[in-house]
């Protein structure tokens, strides 16, 4: 993910020690570092703090590990007004799921339509497909200028199954993108002008 620093925004990117982080382990880690007695970070709901779990569908969906994470986020959101009378319920805890993986979000920075299955099937993985489709690969210095395109393209291509889960080639990361865009809009305009 890319972030453009802002004076009025503090972003804490919390990594996980292992590759392919299990959503249930992410949830437990969040409980520990954000909610536990020995928490490392403090959430200020009065300031509109939010927490985002950006996850791939991978095998986690089949293993039933995403639904509990979503349930945990919902229950945390429901608790906010109970803990703080002056704070109305809002989506402080969020899941941004991509199907099949985060790279679909990168793909939509450049393309308006979902990829064709026949094109994707030529590659060993969707990540390889995206790497070959974006000439030179995704440039994290230059390509954030395409954030608004990515938001629009992803929003226009999102579809969900009967349970509200993103279907193939869909991503909820655009919702996080909309939140980021509120703070970086003018900087992205400057970057677009600089790049021509």
What residue ranges belong to the model's regions?
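C-terminal accessory helical subdomains adjacent to catalytic cores in phosphodiester-
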Residues: 2-17, 24, 30-52, 57-196
């Amino acid at each position: 993910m890319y972030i453009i620093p802002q004076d009025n925004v503090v972003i804490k990117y919390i990594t996980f020690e292992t590759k392919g982080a299990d959503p249930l382990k992410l949830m437990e880690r969040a409980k520990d570092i954000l909610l536990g007695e020995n928490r490392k970070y403090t959430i200020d709901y009065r300031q509109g703090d939010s927490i985002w779990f950006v996850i791939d569908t991978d095998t986690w969906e089949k293993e039933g590990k995403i639904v509990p994470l979503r349930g945990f986020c919902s229950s945390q959101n429901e608790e906010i007004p109970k803990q703080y009378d002056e704070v109305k319920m809002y989506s402080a805890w969020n899941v941004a799921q991509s199907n099949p993986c985060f790279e679909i979000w990168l793909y939509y920075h450049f393309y308006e339509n979902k990829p064709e299955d026949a094109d994707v099937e030529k590659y060993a993985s969707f990540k390889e497909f995206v790497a070959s489709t974006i000439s030179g690969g995704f440039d994290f210095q230059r390509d954030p200028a395409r954030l608004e395109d990515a938001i629009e393209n992803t929003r226009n291509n999102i579809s969900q199954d009967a349970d509200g889960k993103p279907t193939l080639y869909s991503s909820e990361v655009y919702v996080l993108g909309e939140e980021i865009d509120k703070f970086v809009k003018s900087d992205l305009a400057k970057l677009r002008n600089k790049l021509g």
